[in-house]
């Protein structure tokens, strides 16, 4: 058996949902989609086909998880066509670049790592077109 996608959903924790939403909307030039329940608040990343692709969100859920710049899994967000286009917006939006654009290999493209406004370590990935 093989997965269609190894990841089906991800959540990036926030302490200030509005600040995090502004950060991610700025660096990716997107509009996030609100999804709130009595137990948590989310702002989902827009994707072409949420039911068959990989989706994710920034999320605020008291006591469920906390931001970390050093611990836990490292999520790689799609930065196609070029990681640098997103990196150029990180610091002005309130984040910090911790690994600059770095080539993985010619066929696997580039990666970078930043810390967002909430203190989360998040990675970027782009593949040569």
Where are these regions (language model features)?
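Conserved active-site tyrosine of GNAT-family acetyltransferases
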Residues: 20-24, 90, 119
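Core segments of cupin and vicinal oxygen chelate
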Residues: 2, 11-54, 105
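Active-site beta-strand termini and strand-to-loop segments that position acidic
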Residues: 45-50, 114-117, 127
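Vicinal oxygen chelate
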Residues: 7-15, 64-89, 110-115
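N-terminal beta-strand motif that seeds the catalytic metal site of vicinal oxygen chelate
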Residues: 1-21, 73-75, 125-129
């Amino acid at each position: 058996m093989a997965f269609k996608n190894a990841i089906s959903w991800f959540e990036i924790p926030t302490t200030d949902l509005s600040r995090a939403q502004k950060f991610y909307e700025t660096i990716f030039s997107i509009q996030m989609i609100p999804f709130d329940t009595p137990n948590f608040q989310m702002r989902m990343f827009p994707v072409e086909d949420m039911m068959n692709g990989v989706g994710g969100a920034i999320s605020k859920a008291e006591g469920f998880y906390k931001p970390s710049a050093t611990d836990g899994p490292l999520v790689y967000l799609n930065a196609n066509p070029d990681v640098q286009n997103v990196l150029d917006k990180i610091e002005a939006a309130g984040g910090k670049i911790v690994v600059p654009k770095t080539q993985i290999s010619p066929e696997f493209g580039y990666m970078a790592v930043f810390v967002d406004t909430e203190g989360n370590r998040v990675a970027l990935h782009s593949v040569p077109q």
